[in-house]
A protein has these predicted regions:
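Basic, amphipathic alpha-helical segments enriched in Lys/Arg and hydrophobic/aromatic residues
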Residues: 204-240
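Phosphate-backbone recognition surface of nucleic-acid-processing proteins
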Residues: 126, 131-204, 208, 235, ...
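Charged, alpha-helix-enriched surfaces in structured cytosolic catalytic cores
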Residues: 24, 49, 56, 127, ...
Length: 240
């Protein structure tokens, strides 16, 4: 079983165990498992891990390309030429990686079917599809509140007595949330259900960021229901 190390460490602090050694860690983990009884979840398959590695590598290449592009703006002469060559190489690597990701999805009967379902929703492309399949195997197996909390797009209350703080999202699976964010930027333009939901929030006076996070939640809820039911995009029939 794999558990969130932050949860275990917070549990240790809550029980007054501030020291940290291998032996103490083992005791804390045992006490955590006994007290909290986290729900066991299956480890990703070898294929899912391989797909996840490709998704991670793609993100690394994107970050490298962004960094090199920023350096190029200030470079001159031979250095700029070297950066141009490296940027071209990174573009080729990204193209090859995208083809490899597409091949992995198309050559797997299970993934091919799931990918077809997910990509039937406007705004959902190959990168979000591969990310969800590799890093969110619980998609379609949890209810809409549970999947939103797992990804980290469910706002949490911060209230105390008469004081009411702003609701904020926190925790969750950062890599999934980052790709979902980019997909939602597309969905608010191209997906009728997400676009109308986003626009209603804007018209009600919500800030762009608040409306966008809520739209991320909306898109994830739709994809969770589609995966659960094994059905392609049918806005009128999909429910949480």
């Amino acid at each position: 079983m794999v558990v969130n190390p932050r949860q275990v460490r917070d549990f240790a602090k809550a029980t007054g165990r501030l020291a940290k050694t291998d032996r103490l860690d083992a005791e804390v983990i045992a006490h955590f498992a006994e007290a909290v009884r986290p729900e066991p979840r299956a480890l990703p398959s070898a294929d899912a891990q391989a797909l996840g590695e490709l998704v991670t590598r793609r993100q690394q290449l994107i970050e490298m390309r962004t960094a090199e592009g920023n350096r190029r703006r200030l470079a001159t002469g031979r250095l700029r030429q070297q950066l141009d060559e490296h940027l071209a190489w990174l573009d080729r690597q990204l193209d090859d990686l995208d083809k490899e990701l597409d091949d992995m999805l198309r050559n797997s009967p299970i993934w091919r079917e799931q990918a077809d379902v997910l990509r039937s929703a406007k705004g959902v492309g190959p990168i979000l599809t591969a990310t969800l399949l590799s890093a969110l195997p619980e998609l379609g197996q949890l209810n809409h509140k549970e999947i939103a909390a797992l990804v980290g797009v469910a706002p949490f209350n911060r209230d105390s007595g008469m004081w009411q703080g702003k609701r904020q999202i926190w925790g969750g699976r950062g890599p999934v949330r980052a790709v979902l964010y980019m997909a939602t930027l597309s969905a608010v333009r191209t997906n009728p259900a997400v676009r109308s939901f986003y626009q209603r929030l804007i018209n009600a006076g919500k800030l762009h960021k608040v409306a966008l996070v809520a739209s991320m939640h909306k898109l994830l809820t739709i994809l969770n229901a589609m995966t659960r039911d094994g059905r392609h995009w049918q806005p009128a029939e999909i429910t949480p």
